[in-house]
Amino acid sequence: DNDTFDLLGLLYAQMQREVREQAPAQALLAKLQVPVVRAALADAHFFVRDQHPVRELLNTVAESGAVWLGEDDADPQLLHKLGSAVDKIVNDYQGDEAVFAAANDDIQTHLRTLARKAEVAERRHVDAARGKERLESAKQQAQARIEQLCEQSAPPRFVQSLLRQAWSDVLTLTLLRQGEQSPEWDERQALTARIGEVTCRSKGQPTDIALGTDVETALLQVGYHHDEAAAIARRLSTPGGEDEVTSRTELAAKLKARARLGDQGDNAARKQAATPRTPAEEECYLQVRSLPFGTWFEFVVNQQGDLRRQRLSWYSPMTGNALFVNQRGQKVGEHSLDSLARLMAGGQARLVVEEKSRLIDRAWHATVRTLRSLAGQSPVSEGQP
């Protein structure tokens, strides 16, 4: 009996080393000590049966605490289920290990339900991120087409400004809605070329009424108000980009007050990320660009060095935007791959090396190594008994 107590003491000590000190799992493991001792005393094979129901239950409870690095990581629903299962064992165990097995089965069923919910939630966030990615791709393609026109035709400066702001929205949404191979996209490209041709003519020549109508219609289709669309259309269909109705200042003010398509303040972040990377940051950058989706990270969240665990759910090879979720599939952060690499190089983020073996097995093998060391024997690998 004394040997059993000693072994359990060592086993518990090893398990608790892998669980955060203030994690709820610590209290749950403590509550389980009495029924676990009783089960170990009743079964001579307790320490050698890998799939022993008590060890299975201990592993489930301990592993829940090993991944919760802070209060934000804890899952209230799972914590409630774990607490209920432990209370049931404490109250109902009278020597039948089936009580542990039933409690563990109940928890595992709950875990599978949570995993499905997390998968659905995560998929929703990934779909939204991919939608932003498609929008960004369309914006870049539209901007490239406009820059090509401005370089080749050199329309008046204010016309170029209108093209880059208002007409860019038209091209972007056409690409998103209809696609690059669509007749609508071909029509918009033809209109773009026509705008360049007409506005480059010398002032005083007649307005292209048909072009103005087409431009105004296109702007209305992407959400511009009638007066804005009409004012922009007049300038984009008149030689020299002139308009006697609405002044440049008035139109520029209206456009400045209007939210740009897909503009969420990302430009400043991109400019900041353009700072050259150090060799260490570049090495980390190359590493993160090759990581598979689903890789776990730990981020330092304060000056005390507290950590938060987040999973790299998805990233864009084109823009470098990366989406992070927690265990429940909830979006908890966004980083660019560039900023992520800088955090890693600065010691503020690190990859989590996931253990292949179960926590209970690692704890048991560590216990065995401790016993062998105390007995003056050579340590053995985890694969050995």
Question: Language-model features: where?
Answer:
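Extended, low-complexity, amphipathic alpha-helical coiled-coil/linker regions that act as scaffolds
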Residues: 1-385
